[in-house]
From Swiss-Prot:
Homodimer. It comes from Halorhodospira halophila (strain DSM 244 / SL1). This is Chaperone protein HtpG. The keyword Membrane does not apply. One of its GO terms (molecular function) is unfolded protein binding. Keywords: ATP-binding, Chaperone, Cytoplasm, Nucleotide-binding, Stress response. Belongs to the heat shock protein 90 family. The lineage of its organism: Bacteria, Pseudomonadati, Pseudomonadota, Gammaproteobacteria, Chromatiales. InterPro entries: HATPase_C_sf (IPR036890), Heat_shock_protein_90_CS (IPR019805), HSP90_C (IPR037196), Hsp90_fam (IPR001404), Hsp90_N (IPR020575), Ribosomal_Su5_D2-typ_SF (IPR020568).
Amino acid sequence: MSADTQSETLEFQAEVQQLLSLMIHSVYSNREVFLRELISNASDAIDKLRFEALQQESLYEDDPELKIRVEADPEARTVTVIDNGIGMSREDVIENLGTIAHSGTRRFLEQLTGDQHKDAQLIGQFGVGFYSAFVVADRVEVYTRKAGAAAAEGVRWSSDGQGAYTVDTVERAERGTAVVLHLPEAQQEFCDDMRLRQIIRKYSDHISVPIEMPVRNADQGDDADSEAEAPQWEIVNRASALWMRPKSEISEEDYQELYKHVAHDFDDPLTWIHNHVEGRQSYVSLLYIPKRPPFDLYEQKPAHGVKLYVRRVFITEDTEHLLPRYLRFVRGVIDSDDLPLNISREMLQHNPMISSLRSASVKRILDRLECMAKNEPEDYATFWQAFGRVFKEGIAEDPGNRERIARLLRFSSTHEEKETPDVSLDDYVARMKDGQEKIYYVTAESFNAARNSPHLEIFRRHGIEVLLLPDPVDEWLVAHLHEYDGKQLASVAKGELDLEALGEEDDKQARQEKEQAYEDLCKRLGETLGERVSEVRVSHRLTDSPACLVVGEYDFGMGMQRLLQAAGHQLPAGQPALEVNPDHSVIERLATESGQRFEDWALTLYEQSLLAEGGQLEDPAAYVRRVNNLLAG
């Protein structure tokens, strides 16, 4: 080789300086990912060697144990990542490291055909991973030799990232590549042995290739003899992707240990779903359902979720792309063989494959929950206690699975009136009365408020079950779940009741007579209450309470109205109706009053009804004075 080709300085192509600046300051805001990217490239190189050696075993030379090594030198402020993979020739170095938008791995993939795609587990589609080194380094050196080449054909590449790089031919006995990062003082933290181990375990723990670091002995001296000794190496990653193994080879303890690692939880999981998928998409998913809710379950962006790997390399924990929000409690791993990534690997590309993977994961989770609800009711009760409130959000978020989600819902009801929600919609439908066509429910701000709602009185008299919905999310649930199994869901606190369906058809004439008898009282009450109510009418739903408030059949429930108002939404004008019980002594007494006492009685009756619905009084002090005056006679 002539002297002219021994050393040369070349300009980066494709406006590399502009792209480097963009990547360093925008894309790679999380600086520690440089190590993930370099280890990923090293893993690619080893995988490429493994594939090539299938046809040419001599490429292993005398070093068949494939590995990645990471070493820091705090005094020199360097971090070195070494692999004994395929390596690069001088031409490879210029082509692959001189252009930001090109990757030897990508070209390698393009040259493969047929089944070879399956065996070549490679990443590096866009070729910017290597340049993440400049996020922390002010100078980078690469020493490499291609497998099968002579030791004299080693190559040294060097650059400060400022627009040019130098390529030299050097003697190199070792096959593979060593990337040496020279760090400025501001990045000194990455020379710390423990810091590097922490990054490796965070991002590269499950790469199937062993990642080694020098053993740090407490009694290791600093004398020349100690420095001359060859370092002892130890594996710092697990070097085994547990989820890739057949289920028959994985113990329950193995599954639980992995869960605690990926979920940062001390408890064992409630259950898990492990699937190997091959076909148009090849991937493995191992999804866990925890026993208890994490502390950040209701935060906009939880700290943990489902980890996405591509060929055992951790990419992201951005669960939003992988599962809908109502399943944000799920933890685990999805490892894809062929999922494409965007240029920074920080976010997933908008790609139909992601949508397909997400849909399949949702289906498997719902399958598991259905199986648990049927065969393991105690475990399902644990799940519902922990995540039922979040899971209910799926009725609004996931219309495609609404029926399946509805089947998994659990409620309290008047059937037993216990606070533990264990009544399914199927249970309710199975207990419906002959001729009953609707599933009745009542919403409230607490279980006791729901159980004691005056709206339930007529239903109790006829033995008709009513679902008790005390969660704030229940208002959203019933706003999107209009029917189940062909039965309409109906609020007992909305509109006028179909009394014939409740077995009240024989009392129709008596009801009409009472409406006429109290027509004048209803009119007087309406005039006194004014715009507080839309109308006052005789109630046919009350048996024990003197009055209640009823919204229109198509209006928001009073609880929903309060939620929307608290969120700053403008609501359409409309007021509830006040229904009075003509058989109650308070109403009979009210009919005999007049003047100020009638007004006090009317306002007290209205405000008591408002309180029973969980509402708030505009002037509590005035209410107390009125009640005291009425008590005083």
